[in-house]
Amino acid sequence: MLYDKSLERDNCGFGLIAHIEGEPSHKVVRTAIHALARMQHRGAILADGKTGDGCGLLLQKPDRFFRIVAQERGWRLAKNYAVGMLFLNKDPELAAAARRIVEEELQRETLSIVGWRDVPTNEGVLGEIALSSLPRIEQIFVNAPAGWRPRDMERRLFIARRRIEKRLEADKDFYVCSLSNLVNIYKGLCMPTDLPRFYLDLADLRLESAICLFHQRFSTNTVPRWPLAQPFRYLAHNGEINTITGNRQWARARTYKFQTPLIPDLHDAAPFVNETGSDSSSMDNMLELLLAGGMDIIRAMRLLVPPAWQNNPDMDPELRAFFDFNSMHMEPWDGPAGIVMSDGRFAACNLDRNGLRPARYVITKDKLITCASEVGIWDYQPDEVVEKGRVGPGELMVIDTRSGRILHSAETDDDLKSRHPYKEWMEKNVRRLVPFEDLPDEEVGSRELDDDTLASYQKQFNYSAEELDSVIRVLGENGQEAVGSMGDDTPFAVLSSQPRIIYDYFRQQFAQVTNPPIDPLREAHVMSLATSIGREMNVFCEAEGQAHRLSFKSPILLYSDFKQLTTMKEEHYRADTLDITFDVTKTTLEATVKELCDKAEKMVRSGTVLLVLSDRNIAKDRLPVPAPMAVGAIQTRLVDQSLRCDANIIVETASARDPHHFAVLLGFGATAIYPYLAYETLGRLVDTHAIAKDYRTVMLNYRNGINKGLYKIMSKMGISTIASYRCSKLFEAVGLHDDVVGLCFQGAVSRIGGASFEDFQQDLLNLSKRAWLARKPISQGGLLKYVHGGEYHAYNPDVVRTLQQAVQSGEYSDYQEYAKLVNERPATTLRDLLAITPGENAVNIADVEPASELFKRFDTAAMSIGALSPEAHEALAEAMNSIGGNSNSGEGGEDPARYGTNKVSRIKQVASGRFGVTPAYLVNADVIQIKVAQGAKPGEGGQLPGDKVTPYIAKLRYSVPGVTLISPPPHHDIYSIEDLAQLIFDLKQVNPKAMISVKLVSEPGVGTIATGVAKAYADLITIAGYDGGTGASPLSSVKYAGCPWELGLVETQQALVANGLRHKIRLQVDGGLKTGVDIIKAAILGAESFGFGTGPMVALGCKYLRICHLNNCATGVATQDDKLRKNHYHGLPFKVTNYFEFIARETRELMAQLGVTRLVDLIGRTDLLKELDGFTAKQQKLALSKLLETAEPHPGKALYCTENNPPFDNGLLNAQLLQQAKPFVDERQSKTFWFDIRNTDRSVGASLSGYIAQTHGDQGLAADPIKAYFNGTAGQSFGVWNAGGVELYLTGDANDYVGKGMAGGLIAIRPPVGSAFRSHEASIIGNTCLYGATGGRLYAAGRAGERFGVRNSGAITVVEGIGDNGCEYMTGGIVCILGKTGVNFGAGMTGGFAYVLDESGDFRKRVNPELVEVLSVDALAIHEEHLRGLITEHVQHTGSQRGEEILANWSTFATKFALVKPKSSDVKALLGHRSRSAAELRVQAQ
């Protein structure tokens, strides 16, 4: 099957509690359990209502408790002893065998066995699912010989455990939770509240600890396993390690480099890192190795999860040298990571460089510190608190229970940098290439190939005229990728009858739901392409000789870089060239690849450090080995032979020219790449004046363009550094034979077989025959746009013409002509190789369900108003409403005038930009679709060119006319599966009647993700294929990201069925659907609903010219140009209804032939499809049988949606507030209410706002507000979607997403009276507050977290400090900050403005200056008064001491405020044009 049950992803809630001075108590344990219960909403509950996905505790070894246990049994425990917590097999014989092996290996280490203990448990509290997999749970007590130190024992326990695990590898139920003399772990598949009821030890008051880590898991699987509950042996992790495949690969490659005198037999423990299963456990493995090798927990975590140090100009040079030195020994383990860890002495919390997980801490007077995903997870009195804060991006907070100190990053880093003279070592030993920009002209390089030879090389490497003009020229001229529109409607490489280069067979993987893409445009400060080459050394040995490296800023080499590299004199950098061409008359491609591996191995053994793979030596009979094949095969060989870390793979190739090509080479092991033919080609374009720039500029532009493309590809997967991306193999090989994958691309996902070595050799031969014939011109191409005689396009002119003829005439016979062209086309998609086999029991068409029932299953795909003209957008809505289907608003909002009419879009999309998302928008929806990814460009945000942002479009999107709008790549409130569950909860609270849909894009593992989405209580999942359309997207995204929906749909169907969830969720497919045949095939493969994008647009008149992004659509469909819309748009709704009527008719005819009366009865009927043999040699090697496999349904459960998916949390406080306020809302009466609140009360205010928006609109109750006062800690999304007329006052603090999507009203948050801390130094609200807000006011007397005001489009706010990336993508509103800000302030800010207090005078350094400028407020009198008025209101609403201090010393503070505004804004107009700013313009009484 395509669905792999072993693939599991998880996210969670996590935390730690510790007594700072190390005093053990049962209170610490009890508080940790209480905290876990308060984060139950961050986990998942399975169908039996009692089984969780896993939770657990890691505590200091409870010495007093264990000594009592031993005494009761008559055991004598030595001064130094260990306790192992083991899961054993239920089978008594296997359990006995495991005990015997455990004892043998421990005794081999001269450790003496004290005894075994059955851990007291109460199975009655477990659910059926947990009970069915419950292992035997036992503890083993072990004494150390006299004189052993605890760390010595810990190291020998590590070696013993690894030997035990290797001997018991076949017993899948055996698992060592912990085997340590420092810490102990209790974990399992119960609910958090049941943990002490299951493990009776935890309820025993004698069990004490000064440290306790806790973890609540949310898995994408409904059959979770006991061992995967966390914590692991040292850490608990919330997030996902995006780089895990590369980290595991490098851990294996470095095995021979790990050496330490502390463990002479360390290699007995290899492999050190598990290569399958949980990413968190792999990181725990590596941390354990580093600690065993003598590293302390602080250096180990700074090595694994370093901050973003490369682009920090203010970093201390000594500290920079420390991180630089470390980077030479290990790549970052990168991805969303909130990590808590402990070795028994230290307890620590570490955050990833992007700050993608929340970590809030509270310190109380009794010396307890809690740090967790949320604040408010245990109940303390306000006057007990001495400090509140958060761990920020890249920060490490350490509690040293021995010295009784809390160490923040500044202190730990000060210690680390001073341990060795890193700066001196680096300056003395690291070589750096002379930058291309600094070289004299004669060293820049020039063309080496004459025109004829250049043409031959271009033809051999399959260049096309189209590629020269649309890809290479654009990169050289503009320094960035070309943008295109529409989707990819050409055949996959393996289906094509044209020769295609091997790069075309690889599809980029991308992050969705369980981890986010990151933002290479606005958050580039965390990203780096910096590359070091040389021999790697032993990470456990810090010495000057380990700093011999040669460093440069990008792995893409220019001529001068390559020359410098290959002419180094030192032995450290010895370079030798390996020719990767072969004589086709004497050998084969496959044999050559194997021979290259042999040669490479021999060269590295003989001392080669820079292994240069070159394909320059081609000739008539000499063909190039495709560079990725050579790189991948040699990488695997060198890793297997323990040689990879002594060599670097440099690729001198003609084959790489666009960013995807370089990403493939790097992803499979290349260290650096010299694309000589791309430079030769650009040189000719300069010589022929096709590019009117000098050679140096063009080469630099090209490399900058490739660098940007690499950043984008890495960021799609959430990866920040090239070191972590290298060897990560984050591609699916679609259409490669297993032999090719096995030899060259080991570890890449490949599911359907395909092209063999022989096929590639034949392609190379065919290209060679053409290459050396001077009269044969370079190919015209046709991959990007239709070219007569070139690559087949599914929307070729004939298809477009016949479809438009059919919808205009309304004649079914015309449609049949169109359908014949589509259904009998050359194999273009995988489904084209699956034929429908008519059944023997045909039925009368009158018995088939009517077209009106099918129409309910048809949606038009999301296309925004802005991308489409208003007329086209409304026509789609009218058409779908008239037949009972659904149109989708897309991500650009919708005109409220359309609500309640036949022009309303019944599906409202919520995308990452949140354009126009208000409570009224959401309540006027039957379906709310969360667009996690888009088929044409997964991992990227939407894009609307400035020419299309007219005043009308800007009004709908709450933005500035004429300014390009780019959505962030991630939803900033979805960094994990539990974040998605929270957004679904937010939406269900505001509009309980709407179905919540989640749009995913097909990729390997999408079934696993879809299972998690279903567990997050979505109602509908859309699986989009790579061939979906787009209004504007980089060309490499359109061509190389996303996979066929056939693979994604089948995997998702199999996953949902296998996990017993399919009957609870609807499954939709979209991407390239054109005819009734597509509907039938998609239904058989699992879909019960269908999305159409391009087809309806073509029906409206689109001619598929691919110029949507230029705003000059010739038919007025995809333009905002008044003249084009008025003179050329003829798209009436009847054309769209005709199209769907034709599809429904064809579908019903096919159903009748198949003997099926209801569409849902087709689902899973794969017997009605048969695999065709294929029409080309490559097609014939495809293995599509996995598409026809079905999962075994759970008894009594359907293969399609038959019931609802209600969440366990119904939002009781929300319901209470709405019930009490409803009569007053109906009567438009103001009323005040009071409530207590806790962190489990989430999305408070959403239900009330939804009801107000439904009855009175977004602002209809603003004059008669409902006021609610709360006391305590608010859960996530306090005040989400706040409508005008809702005023929320909170005394206490709040978690993430405060005021998200608020449209009006007021939120005011103040600390409790009598708080001991200063408000502006304490965190009061969490991350991503005011995300997508369009109005209203937020006042908070304290600090906010990361990404405050991201995509703020109109809210006015005052807070007292924020984290990194503040006001990112802001298009409107006013933000006032009375304290410190983090870095990257104002990135992508195109509207609104901000006031920032800059007491230390360094704020300007933390501003992203690309689009904004910083002015002094004291030079702007009206702004000074306006600011003063805002602060006065802040004080009135929150009683802010900070605000009072500033007002009382106004003359001093006024000079310290900066005003940040977009460069495109006129400072004089910032206040004047804002009618809703009138209140702030009052000059307040002083």
Swiss-Prot record:
Disulfide-linked positions: none
Reactions the enzyme catalyzes: 2 L-glutamate + NADP(+) = L-glutamine + 2-oxoglutarate + NADPH + H(+)
Cofactor note text: Binds 1 [3Fe-4S] cluster.
A biological-process GO annotation: glutamate biosynthetic process
Matches recorded under SUPFAM superfamilies: Alpha subunit of glutamate synthase, C-terminal domain, FMN-linked oxidoreductases, N-terminal nucleophile aminohydrolases (Ntn hydrolases)
Obligatory cofactor(s): [3Fe-4S] cluster; FAD; FMN
InterPro entries named among the record's database cross-references: Aldolase_TIM, ET-N_metabolism_enzyme, GATase_2_dom, Glu_synth_asu_C, Glu_synth_asu_C_sf, Glu_synth_centr_N, Glu_synthdom, Ntn_hydrolases_N
GO cellular component: cytosol; glutamate synthase complex (NADPH)
Keywords: 3Fe-4S, Amino-acid biosynthesis, FAD, Flavoprotein, FMN, Glutamate biosynthesis, Glutamine amidotransferase, Iron, Iron-sulfur, Metal-binding, NADP, Oxidoreductase, Zymogen
Domain Glutamine amidotransferase type-2 per the UniProt entry, residue ranges: 12-402
Record: active site: C12
Record pathway: Amino-acid biosynthesis; L-glutamate biosynthesis via GLT pathway; L-glutamate from 2-oxoglutarate and L-glutamine (NADP(+) route): step 1/1; Energy metabolism; nitrogen metabolism
pH relationship of activity: Optimum pH is 7.6.
Protein task: Catalyzes the conversion of L-glutamine and 2-oxoglutarate into two molecules of L-glutamate.
Note: Glutamine binds to the large subunit and transfers the amido group to 2-oxoglutarate that apparently binds to the small subunit.
Family: Belongs to the glutamate synthase family.
UniProt protein name: Glutamate synthase [NADPH] large chain
Name of the gene: gltB
